[in-house]
Design a protein with these regions (language model features):
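Charged, amphipathic alpha-helical coiled-coil/dimerization segments
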Residues: 2-15, 91-151
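Short amphipathic alpha-helical segments with heptad-repeat character
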Residues: 28, 32, 36, 80, ...
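N-terminal helix-turn-helix DNA-binding core of bacterial DNA-binding proteins
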Residues: 36, 40-82, 96, 168
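Active-site phosphate/pyrophosphate-handling residues
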Residues: 26, 58, 147
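N-terminal leader segment of winged-helix/HTH proteins
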Residues: 1-50
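Exposed, interaction-prone assembly regions rather than primary DNA-binding/catalytic cores
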Residues: 147-173
């Protein structure tokens, strides 16, 4: 019986740790490997089906959540990328008629970026397919395992938030 071989990039990622390493390190590398495998399929799907990229999808997702639009600095912060990256992506989406820049009242230099009607339609189609790809990524796991992973990762996330708060408080002292 042939066991499917992991993709080389994932094999390399998990090969960084061995049984003598802390189980937390092995878990971290496993989480990264899973994330990279899913993201790889999503990136390929966005490129193949919508001729777009994950960063463009992510920017449009932020704008979809904020119909009034977001300032460039807010977009940069939410996407955790530089202002230059946001400007480049926004320029492309403006040229394609998917987003627009709208002047902010009372501030001649500031603009909000928001989806156009065409952008809303385009993003809705992408978001529907994106959700399906994510559902498919977990299709081999029973629902109870997905629920358990969700709970456990929620606990991990909360733990990390608390650790970050403590670290920031220590830095202020």
């Amino acid at each position: 019986m042939n066991t499917p071989r992991p993709e080389p990039a994932v094999l390399d990622l998990e090969a960084r740790a061995h049984s003598e390493h802390a189980r937390e390190l092995r878990l971290w590398l496993r989480l990264l490997a899973c994330s990279q495998l899913i993201e790889k399929r999503v990136r390929a799907g966005l490129r193949e089906h919508f001729d777009t990229t994950l960063p463009r999808f992510d920017l449009m997702a932020q704008l979809e959540r904020h119909p009034e639009g977001l300032k460039m600095k807010e977009l940069s912060h939410r996407l955790m990328v530089t202002g230059g990256n946001v400007t480049g992506i926004t320029d492309q989406l403006v040229a394609e008629g998917l987003v627009e820049r709208v002047a902010v009242d009372g501030d001649r230099r500031a603009f909000r970026v928001r989806l156009t009607p065409a952008g809303q339609t385009s993003f809705a189609a992408m978001a529907e397919q994106h959700e399906q790809w994510i559902v498919e990524a977990f299709a081999d796991l029973p629902a109870r395992d997905v629920d358990q992973l969700h709970r456990l990762l929620g606990r991990l996330k909360q733990s990390q938030i608390e650790i970050n708060r403590r670290l920031q408080a220590d830095e202020l002292e």
